[in-house]
Every structure is written in C-alpha cells, then in structure tokens.
C-alpha cells in the first residue's frame, strides 16, 4: 500500500550458517537472505518454493536464488502488492485505483506470472475487494485476497476465490482496527498469518475459519510465507533517500507468546 515505510533490520551473527543451505536450517539457528540490488519502491511481499525466492517491490517483480542473487526481474504496474506461489505460478494482489477509500474507488486484480520465466500469464478481476487488493494467500487450491481498510472500521475482510477466480465468499476477521487493513497473508501450519502496518506493526493469527487466535506486536507487514519443517519466511526492508529500497528475508518459527521468533536476533 502507498505509505512511507521504514523498517529496522536485525543485526545477526551469520558466520555459523553462512554456507548452510536454508532448507536445512532448524529451530535455534539463524538464516537471513538479502535481495540483491535496490529498487524504486518498497517491498510488499515475499514467497518461496524453497528453491527460489520471489520479491514484490511495488513496481518491480524479482526472482532470486536462496542466497539473494537476482535471477530475473521485470517492471510491473503500480501497485503490485503481496504475492503467493502455487502450482508453478505466482499470484500477485494488484490495485490500480485508490486504497482505503470508504467509497470503494479501488481497482482490484490478481495478476498471474510463470514462476520460472516471470512471464505474465493472466489477469483476474477481484473487484469484490472493496478497499483495494494488497495481499494474497492460497489454501487447498483456493485464493484468499486481503487489502485496504478505512479508518474507524474495527474488523478486517478476506475475499475467497476458486481456482478460476470466481468469487466465493467474504470472510470477516474480528481483529479490531489495523492501519490500512492487511498487507500480507499466508496459510501455514494450520493457521492464517496476516501482517499489518501500524505503530507498532501488528501480526494477526487466525484459525482456518478466520477466528482470531492471537494479535501480536511484531512485524511481518512486508512479507510472510509458510515453509516446511514448521518454519516461516518473514520479509523486511527499508528505503533510503537517493539510494532506493532493499529487501531481506529471514527464517522464523511460530511462538505462542510473540507470534513468531527469529533466533539470535533482536527483532524491532
């Protein structure tokens, strides 16, 4: 979503894990990936097939290996938000209109890309996402789109689509208000994870039916993705004037007290 973003990156002792493949990182270890390069706009989301990492930088879609080396990148329409991967394809929440407009003057879409080549394959209208599509997750072959929220609204909304993007249902999360709605989404480890802006930034966790199970003051508003082995991949980044914006991804583990945790890191 269009809002100034400044995120602090954790300073990590990486030497012990620098040469270790991230697929084998276990609880108690640290793994961090810096996306190569800088970009005009800030990070919106990350996803992975555990072979490559995909990064949405608002107007640039980037594919890297698991060390952060760029393999492919393409310019994309403003505003590409959060993304997910399914069946060899990337699905990106896109808004071409106004975010967070109480009158619903958004223009919500999901754009589909080939995960190998980043070639665009399809565009699906998701105009039911009334305040602007900003995030997307997938579960059992169905897609769940989240997005903006005007001030004063004390709940969030999730819009469910089938595999051909036929609208199925609008779900309500009794979350209380979150600034500009929900930015990132993933279904992992039998629950939904939703990253939100704010001061402090907020993580919402629900069960599979969108009933709240936790609200945490921890930041995954720039990306969260489920991984095998009970792990999560969490995105972060920052923008520097005259230098551009960068992105980082770190492996985390669910934690019932804090939402999730990074090992050996002071997370801010």
Predicted feature residues:
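A short beta-strand motif characteristic of beta-propeller blades
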Residues: 28-37, 68-74, 119-126, 167-175, ...
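Beta-strand-rich domains and repeat architectures in extracellular enzymes and scaffolds
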Residues: 32-59, 79-81
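Repeated scaffold domains used in trafficking and secretory/extracellular systems
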Residues: 40-45, 78-85, 128-138, 178-184, ...
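Short coil/turn segments that connect the beta-strands within blades of beta-propeller domains
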Residues: 50-51, 87-88, 140-142, 189-190, ...
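Short, solvent-exposed loop/turn segments at conserved positions within beta-propeller repeat blades
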Residues: 55-56, 100-108, 149-155, 197-199, ...
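Short loop/turn segments that connect beta-strands within beta-propeller blades
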Residues: 65-69, 114-118, 162-166, 206-209
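Blade-loop segments of beta-propeller domains
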Residues: 69-100, 108
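Beta-propeller blade signature
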Residues: 105-115, 156-163, 248-261
């Amino acid at each position: 979503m269009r809002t100034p973003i400044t995120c602090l990156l954790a300073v990590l002792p990486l030497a012990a894990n620098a040469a270790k493949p991230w697929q084998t990182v276990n609880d108690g270890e640290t793994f961090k990936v810096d996306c190569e390069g800088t970009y005009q706009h800030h990070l919106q989301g990350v996803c992975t097939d555990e072979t490559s990492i995909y990064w949405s930088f608002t107007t640039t879609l980037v594919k890297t290996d698991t060390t952060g080396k760029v393999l492919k990148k393409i310019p994309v329409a403003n505003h590409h938000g959060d993304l997910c991967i399914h069946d060899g394809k990337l699905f990106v929440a896109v808004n071409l209109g106004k975010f967070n407009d109480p009158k619903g003057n958004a223009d919500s879409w999901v754009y589909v890309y080939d995960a190998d080549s980043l070639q665009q394959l399809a565009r699906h209208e998701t105009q039911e996402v009334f305040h602007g599509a900003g995030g997307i997750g997938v579960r059992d072959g169905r897609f769940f789109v989240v997005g903006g929220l005007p001030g004063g609204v004390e709940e969030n909304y999730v819009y469910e689509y089938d595999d051909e993007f036929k609208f199925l249902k609008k779900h309500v999360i009794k979350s209380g208000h979150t600034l500009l709605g929900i930015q990132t989404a993933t279904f992992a480890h039998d629950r939904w994870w939703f990253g939100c802006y704010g001061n402090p930034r907020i993580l919402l966790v629900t069960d599979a039916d969108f009933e709240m199970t936790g609200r945490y003051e921890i930041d995954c508003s720039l990306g969260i993705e489920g991984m095998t082995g009970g792990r999560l991949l969490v995105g972060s980044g920052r923008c520097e004037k005259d230098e551009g914006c960068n992105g980082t991804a770190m492996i985390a583990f669910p934690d019932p007290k804090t939402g999730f945790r990074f090992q050996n890191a002071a997370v801010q």
